[in-house]
Amino acid sequence: MNFSLLFSADVTDRFDRVFWFGDFNFRIQKSRESVDRIMKRHARDQQTIIRELLLHDQLNEVFDRGKIFHGFKENEITFMPTYKFDVNTDVYDSSPKKRVPSWTVK
């Protein structure tokens, strides 16, 4: 065992796998109307919706520019945005705020 790695400040040297958890509060950089159009246009193909929305995901943008999570990669996102639904429904926010569907807790 290489004990110098055990005390390294770089967690990628110290562990085989690292999991980041939390509400990072990154959003999709599109208007609610634009996101709704994308979802309607590709209603029969969720993976196309996901791919198109991820092009505008704030976390992906700063990650791709090398601003955060150096040395890490994110697994492929294969699920629809999880934020924000009306309570006890699968309907995205219909309140006056009309929050943009996003992956705020990936």
Predicted feature descriptions by range:
Residues M1-K106:
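Catalytic lobes of large eukaryotic enzymes
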